[in-house]
């Protein structure tokens, strides 16, 4: 499920995990609304879209009950803002979210996807006798035409560590071109978190395994094993027991106000205190998204203050739920697992930490200049009287 354009070129395609969405469009009745010129669709984009036409990625997403049920609950929670309205599903995939919106009473749903899975979505819509309500458009969000404004935009745009694949830009494109003033965006807000972790089992499986293999000494393989296992970010599931400190907030996104250039580079500082004595094996990213109605929009300054590098405390005292708390989809280690898992940056050499030991530094996440869907990650941290730097590319 795919939304929009990225930098072109040949080379390493993004890992085919969950599908990325294709976008949709629309404007006011009559002349299509004016908007920014669409980015070109490159050969690289076409190969990327083709990779996600495979049924497996959609099966994985639909079998993620946390993800799918949270979206369905959020749609029904906002039924009063969806019933009788026009909805745009940016990157519809199999069309499940579009159909949920139709069940919630939407007058019309434009379901858009750039991958060939859109052809299957058409059949699914027809099978459910919703062709009079759900209009499937096969194309990029930047290229399709819809001759009316929309009241609601829904999209499952999140990639690994929230921002991988750069699909949020396509949601922004759709918002600026077609969303009516005061319209609804689901999800409405997102937060990206970072925390130091310990994971001895991972080192045992990937590195220390080579010390003795069937009675044969293979320690000479360990340096290569570390390079292969820990050079790039790793997507895997950890538990709350692996996390050494309360997380810090790397970025917060308000989908009502965020602009695409703000996503090009994000920098945040952190200052952690280890809650136990354990080896520091790396750092973990995870995210959550909220489903807020328009009346709960935050100011642009408040919503994006972390994009300016300000750190916020994400401890439980700052995450207490209020009576009117929004629906939240979380990928945190302590919550039910999802297909996003967590994104881990492992160190080549563990660092022994004492209880209450300090770890401070900064993290910078930037879109790759070669392939906009890739992320460059630079982690700088200071502990035990020494500075360290970990640089990785999420691709």
Curated annotation (Swiss-Prot):
Alphabetical keyword list: Methyltransferase, S-adenosyl-L-methionine, Transferase
Name of this protein: Probable protein arginine N-methyltransferase 6.2
Protein purpose: Arginine methyltransferase that can both catalyze the formation of omega-N monomethylarginine (MMA) and asymmetrical dimethylarginine (aDMA).
MF (Gene Ontology): histone methyltransferase activity; protein-arginine N-methyltransferase activity
Binding-site list for S-adenosyl-L-methionine: 58, 67, 91, 113, 142
Region (Disordered): 1-37, 300-324
UniProt-listed Pfam families: PrmA, PRMT_C
Active site: 156, 165
Record-annotated membrane-spanning stretches: none
Gene Ontology BP term (one): methylation
Domain of life where this protein originates: Eukaryota
Biased composition (Polar residues): 302-317
């Amino acid at each position: 499920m795919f939304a929009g354009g990225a930098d072109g070129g040949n080379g390493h395609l993004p890992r085919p995990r969950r599908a990325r969405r294709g976008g949709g469009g629309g404007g006011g009745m009559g002349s299509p609304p004016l908007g920014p010129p669409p980015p070109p669709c490159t050969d690289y984009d076409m190969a990327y879209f083709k990779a996600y036409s495979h049924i497996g990625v959609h099966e994985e997403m639909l079998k993620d009950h946390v993800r799918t049920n949270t979206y369905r609950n959020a749609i029904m929670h906002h039924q009063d803002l969806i019933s009788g309205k026009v909805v745009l599903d940016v990157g519809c995939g199999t069309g499940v979210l579009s159909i949920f919106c139709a069940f919630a009473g939407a007058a019309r749903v434009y379901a858009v996807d750039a991958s060939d899975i859109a052809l299957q979505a058409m059949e699914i819509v027809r099978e459910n006798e919703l062709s009079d309500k759900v209009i499937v458009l096969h194309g990029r969000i930047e290229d399709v035409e819809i001759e009316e404004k929309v009241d609601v935009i829904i999209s499952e745009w999140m990639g690994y560590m929230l921002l991988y694949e750069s699909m949020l830009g396509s949601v922004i494109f759709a918002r600026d071109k077609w969303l009516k003033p005061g319209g609804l965006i689901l999800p409405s807000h997102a937060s990206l978190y970072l925390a130091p972790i310990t994971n001895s089992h991972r080192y045992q499986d990937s590195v220390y395994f080579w010390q003795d293999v069937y009675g044969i000494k293979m320690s000479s393989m360990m340096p290569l094993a570390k390079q292969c296992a820990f050079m790039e970010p790793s997507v895997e599931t950890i538990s709350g027991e692996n996390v050494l400190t309360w997380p810090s907030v790397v970025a917060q996104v308000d989908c009502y106000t965020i602009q695409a250039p703000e996503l090009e580079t994000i920098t945040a500082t952190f200052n952690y205190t280890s809650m136990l004595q354990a080896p520091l094996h790396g750092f973990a990213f995870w995210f959550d998204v909220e489903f807020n109605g328009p009346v709960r929009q935050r100011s642009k300054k408040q919503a994006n203050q972390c994009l300016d590098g300000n750190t916020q405390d994400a401890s439980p005292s700052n995450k207490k739920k209020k009576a009117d708390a929004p629906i939240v989809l979380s990928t945190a280690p302590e919550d039910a697992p999802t297909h996003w898992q967590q994104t881990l940056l492992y160190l080549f050499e563990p660092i022994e930490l004492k209880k209450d030991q300090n770890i401070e530094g900064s993290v910078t996440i930037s879109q790759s200049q070669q392939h906009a869907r890739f992320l460059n990650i630079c982690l700088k941290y200071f502990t035990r009287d020494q500075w360290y730097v970990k640089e990785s590319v999420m691709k």
